Amino acid sequence: MVAPEGLREMEGSALRRLVGREEASGGRCLLLDCRPFLAHSAGHIRGALNVRCNTIVRRRAKGAVSLEQILPAEGEVRARLRAGLYTAVVLYDERSPRAEALRDDSTVALVLRALRRDMARADIRLLAGGYERFASEYPEFCAKTKTLSSISPPSSAESLDLGFSSCGTPLHDQGGPVEILPFLYLGSAYHAARRDMLDALGITALLNVSSDCPNHFEGHYQYKCIPVEDNHKADISSWFMEAIEYIDSVKECCGRVLVHCQAGISRSATICLAYLMMKKRVKLEKAFEFVKQRRSIISPNFSFMGQLLQFESQVLATSCAVEAASPSGTLRERGKATSTPTSQFVFSFPVSVGVHATPSSLPYLHSPITTSPSC
């Protein structure tokens, strides 16, 4: 059976034989897992690499992702693909029964186009029935670290792709809140209900980005609620400035604020991204990667990402206007040589840290990053 773009299918039995030969002789076949990160972490076919194709990558790429985008940390694999050293590449998602059923905007389709653009000769196949069927038929060829069986069907973008550990604790509730900046933390409703965690981190205020999460300790901490639902109709951007001002007010009082929603994945992450973009004058992509290094499961819904991109254009337009109005900006416009000014838009991101690191274990090695755009 051949798909419109010529993608052929591979049955699980054929892949089982192929995986067995690969493990015995070394890799001429590449397995690419096109499912979300958390699904891959919960279980995957042995030897498979998880492609990176999250919301921000899709928006930036506009349907034309590159190998560098989908396999950013796999330089050797990219080089082997381009050199034609793989005889076969097998793609799989969760349960696609056949190639014709793939949507044009699916992750598999995006990855397929990237491979065909950038790689030398290779036989590209789709695993019929996806991981779900293969894992049920050949569990001995799968690596499973967590179980997804207890997850109910998602009711909103906030609940998509959530995994559970083997002890039953949702991934978004494991560990503690993560430090975004010394005064700004991101976490879930579970973290907001743990007074021991809050006190250990020195939290003095909470920003509750939901309409249904309770404020458990109103006599002990300062609270502010932003009643936003996690759906594609919600206008979260109308709350950006109010949220930013609240975070700044806590900072000015030498306090620390925890921004949370239900899972700490979509709504609260969106607020933290908006804060970084506004106060540090960085693009969404830079802010997203920074926050994701600290809380790897963030995933604002598609509408929120669109609102953040619009906010980015407003923030960077303001940056341009400020620079153009400054004395140094005027001199540049006149074509006169000037010394490089000390930009108000230069700031230092901390280096990458673990997702659940505590403040005492965060070594802040600063390297100034000039983030002001060319106006």
Swiss-Prot record:
Domain Rhodanese: 25-143
Designated gene of the protein: DUSP4
Predominant location: nucleus
Catalytic residues (UniProt): C261
Gene Ontology annotations for the cellular component aspect, listed alphabetically: cytoplasm; nucleus
Subcellular location: Nucleus
Protein name: Dual specificity protein phosphatase 4
Domain Tyrosine-protein phosphatase positions: 176-317
